[in-house]
A protein has these predicted regions:
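Short acidic/polar hinge/loop motifs at secondary-structure boundaries
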Residues: 117, 151-180, 230
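Short, acidic, small-residue-rich periplasmic hinge/interaction motif at the N-terminus
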Residues: 8-13, 43-49, 60-104
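Membrane-embedded beta-barrel scaffold of Gram-negative outer-membrane proteins
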Residues: 345-355, 464, 498-559, 563, ...
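Gram-negative outer-membrane beta-barrel transporters
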Residues: 210, 527-530, 556-673
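Flexible loop and strand-edge segments within Gram-negative outer membrane beta-barrel domains
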Residues: 260-344, 350-368
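Extracytoplasmic beta-strand/coil segments of soluble accessory domains associated
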Residues: 112-151, 155
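Structural signature of Gram-negative outer-membrane beta-barrels, strongest in the C-terminal barrel
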Residues: 291, 334, 380-386, 394, ...
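Outer-membrane beta-barrel translocator/receptor signature
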Residues: 155-157, 170-172, 183-195, 200-274, ...
Length: 742
């Protein structure tokens, strides 16, 4: 692409051995003395690119070298799991990589729809869980951290992921870490990380315009349809992304608008977003820039259906709302490579979320200020290390909090050392973080450690194993948020919540299968997660002094509250496939896998603390005994036993034909009071004990003049599905999309 490539290893190789090595600076410049080595080669290598080699006797100074992108030709490169960019098969932790084609060809208008295709990932409404690590927490608190270009992007007070905020028009790739990453990314990463990496321009100026229009079908049950024959729920939107590079300046700018007049009567959403990135590349190893996003969004919240049999697309009285939000972030950053080979990286972020009430005034706001400094250095070909410090300051305002506003501080220090000797790569890391809310609490994570190894069994086959501690501080909302949800249901904060901690163990094998210049990664893994003082939202009755349920105006009174439920253990296994191959000369891309997990509640069923009893239940859960496990209280609530996901597409000349299937198992256990409160829920759960399956299909025509036309059908068979109790997933939808590249 003619882009500058900093950090390339330049070495003199004689008889297969490296005798001298340096690294190119941030501008791609290098100087190396080759006198006396005329019979040797000058070799250029960098993770994600093919190695180039030149005979020293034949080269002339100055030398300009172009490296071919191995990320597309021979593999995937990731940055989320280590100090620097590395081939995905060399990582010590499990990472899945989602490429832009998957977002474009499936019309993923938000990050949620893209990440949901990842094996082992379950998204309940908007709450994400990796390998059963999370239940459902009603939009507050997340065990999975979202990163945007290396920094966390969880809202300051709610601690939630704003899926619609990510600039999909600028997607470079998304990396999903499927294990605890607290030692790297702190609180919020106890169940994994989703890292959205945005694109930078190549040497060629490029503008991409996208537009789509779609419609929802009528549901299977005609009584759910709240619209008349003159109207059908529709969705449409458009985006633009412009990317341009000058001599020492890079620019990315874009915008997005979207409207979803959805099948849920109060779930409509409209949004408009602007985004920009600017990077300067002066001389002397310096690189700096700034990026920014601003989004206005109107969205309806649909919490519980009115009645499954007759009005599942209408909300229960009092459980819906119409919200208006404004989100923005500004990210100044700087990197510098010193003469000793050290790398200095400073990243900062200001992130604001604000909700407006119907009168237009602000009813809730959170300002998040954060900064991170990292120093990294490769001491030799065997050892590299990084150390750093992190600070976030959160200022949150809401009439639902005590004292109306709250201020919290999260300082942290961290470090990591990586070793590489022959086929073996090792990683050791640690982090210490504090959570301070003046006048309320001061808590510490203690030292959080991780260790891992990766061993190349043979060329193209790598074994990995890792162990990592995790922790999560309770969010402000979990501690303080209190409100009335509907008649008979309140949400009550819990100031006594303790931080949760955990341990994650994982081992796996990744095998790279080559198809000429194409590659498919096959991965198999086993895993176990343990949590202490696990925080889960629980539905409970409000009791009077005699222990009876309080009745107000003939309505039983209940409340949701976040509780430390105690000890839990989740174990399972997973396989996945990701990449591109050729079958009979036809390019085929595949992404998917299957996960099975057993989520044991060791506090309700204390016998499972014994590993032997836990393994017995794990094995029994394969059969028809899961009902007895529910009765015994052996299972964590709001989890399923696993899922199967597969997305596949093939190119036939200018035509691309693709489809996907998602198979989600039944949620075995929920708060049983739900069956009494939500009309028709018990009947719904009796009907769908086998879980749900969804089939999607798409057809893409790639025209010769940089135009692309797509027809995408989601939920092709118009099946009834649900991601969590009390809400139905979308019926069939059909979308036409047009893309054009200037």
């Amino acid at each position: 692409s003619n882009s500058i490539l900093p950090g390339v290893t330049v070495q003199i190789v004689c008889d297969g051995k490296s005798v001298k090595a340096i690294a190119a600076d941030l501008n791609g410049h290098f100087e190396i003395e080759v006198g006396g080595y005329e019979m040797c080669n000058l070799e250029f290598s960098f993770v994600g690119f093919l190695t180039e080699s030149f005979s020293i006797s034949e080269i002339r100074s100055p030398l300009k070298v172009r490296l071919k992108d191995k990320t597309q030709a021979l593999g995937l490169a990731v940055v989320s799991g280590s100090i620097s960019e590395r081939a995905v098969e060399e990582e010590v932790v499990p990472i899945e990589v989602l490429k832009p084609y998957l977002a474009d060809n499936t019309n993923a208008v938000g990050l949620k729809g893209l990440v949901a295709k990842t094996s082992g990932v379950a998204i309940m409404d908007s709450q994400v869980s990796i390998r059963g690590g999370s239940g459902y927490s009603y939009g507050v608190g997340s065990r999975v951290s979202l990163l945007l270009d290396g920094l966390p992007l969880l809202s300051g007070d709610l601690g939630e992921i704003w899926w619609s905020y990510l600039p999909m028009e600028h997607i470079a790739q998304v990396e999903v870490i499927k294990c605890a990453a607290s030692s790297l990314y702190g609180t919020g990463a106890s169940n994994g990380v989703i890292h959205f990496r945005s694109v930078w321009p190549s040497s060629k100026k490029e503008t991409i315009v996208k537009a789509f229009n779609g419609v929802y079908s009528d549901p299977q049950n005609e009584s759910w349809r709240w619209w008349d024959d003159s109207f059908s729920p529709v969705l449409n939107g458009a985006s633009v992304s412009h990317r341009q590079a000058w001599d020492k300046v890079d620019l990315v700018v874009g915008g997005n608008v979207m409207s979803d007049k959805t099948y849920l009567s109060t779930g409509h959403e409209q949004r408009a977003r602007l985004s920009a990135k600017l990077r300067f590349r002066p001389a002397n190893g310096l690189l700096y820039g700034v990026s920014a996003i601003a989004q206005y969004q109107q969205m309806g919240r649909f919490i519980l259906w009115d009645d499954f049999e007759t009005s599942a697309y209408l909300p229960m009285d009092g459980t819906s709302s119409e919200d208006k939000w404004f989100n923005m972030n500004i990210d100044p950053w700087l990197t510098f490579s010193d003469k000793s080979g050290g790398s200095h990286k400073l990243k900062t972020r200001f992130y604001r979320t604000a909700r407006f009430n119907p009168s237009g005034s602000i009813s809730m706001a959170s300002n998040l200020y954060m900064g991170e400094y990292k120093y990294g250095r490769e001491f030799n070909e065997h050892i590299s290390a990084q150390v750093g410090t992190f600070l976030s300051i959160q200022s949150s305002f809401s009439s639902l909090y005590p004292g109306v506003s709250l201020l919290t501080f999260n300082p942290a220090v961290f470090g990591q050392i990586e070793g590489h000797h022959g086929r073996l790569r090792t990683v050791l890391g640690a982090r210490f973080e504090n959570n301070l809310n003046p006048g309320f609490y001061d808590e510490s994570s203690g030292p959080v450690l991780r260790a891992g190894l990766n061993y190349e069994i043979r060329k193209g086959t790598n074994f990995r194993a890792s162990i990592g501690q995790s922790y999560r501080f309770a969010s402000i909302a979990e501690k303080y948020f209190s409100t009335n949800l509907t008649d008979g249901i309140d949400v009550i904060g819990n100031i006594d919540l303790q931080s949760e901690s955990g341990l994650n163990l994982e081992a796996g094998i990744k095998h790279k299968v080559m198809f000429g210049d194409k590659v498919v990664y096959l991965d198999a893994a086993v895993f176990m997660l343990e949590y202490e003082d696990m925080i889960e939202y629980t539905l409970r009755p409000q009791l009077d002094s005699t222990g009876g349920i309080i009745i107000d105006d003939g309505v039983l009174q209940f409340f949701f509250q976040a509780l430390n439920i105690g000890k839990s253990r989740i174990a399972g296994f997973e396989w996945s496939a990701n990449g591109e191959m050729k079958v009979a000369g036809i390019p085929v891309r595949v992404f998917g896998g299957a996960t099975f997990q057993y989520a044991g509640d060791l506090s309700r069923d204390t016998s499972q603390i014994n590993m032997g009893a836990y393994i017995d239940n794990f094995l029994d859960s394969f059969g028809d005994t899961r009902d007895s496990l529910v009765t015994a209280g052996s299972l964590l609530k709001y989890r399923n036993s696993g899922n199967f996901k597969l997305d596949i597409e093939a190119d036939f000349g200018p035509l691309t034909v693709g489809g996907s299937i998602i198979r989600q198992d039944y949620i075995d256990d929920i708060d049983w009071y739900f069956n009494e409160l939500v009309s028709g829920l018990a009947n719904f759960r009796e009907q769908f004990t086998e879980g749900f399956a969804s089939l999607d299909a798409r057809l893409v025509y790639n025209a010769a003049d940089n135009a692309k036309f797509s027809f995408i059908v989601s939920n092709l068979k118009n099946e009834v599905m649900s991601s969590r109790p009390g809400i139905l997933s979308a019926p069939r939808s059909m979308v036409f999309r047009f893309d054009y590249k200037f």
